């Protein structure tokens, strides 16, 4: 009786991208791709604002879709050539192998990354630089354990680096796009106005009631 139904995904991604001051273009871009049991999440922040910045971040996303099987470090090396004719960008890439319970991470530039395990948050560090401006001599790739109590947040520098995770960021049932939107909302205030394009992308396990 026909092909077997494909299993429900065990991980979800979502995000929000808010252009600075209501601009037509955001210099940020985020995307995710799934292939061969791997889920890869990317966030790119093109240098500056406007269309030229958007072209740089969009070029980064295009490479993710072309080669979703590459490790974070290998994808960033590929981007160094692909972004050479753009302004360049800060880029972070996280790749999740759910079956192995492993998360790989690599980044260049000022993309923030935090991994929650249970109630504990840990920063994932990128190396300084600009993708497309010069080739990185060495590109460290970090490895971390991943389980059903984990959550990954990537964010551009429009979000204050010292933002505090609220209740939404500890939820196991909220859609990741909702979590991202709440993080952006809670991090901005009249005392700390947003001064740049702001993007937050979230990777989370599917809640138990959505699994087969």
Question: For the regions a protein language model found, what residue spans apply to each?
Answer:
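Conserved subregion of the PPM/PP2C metallophosphatase catalytic domain
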Residues: 1-212
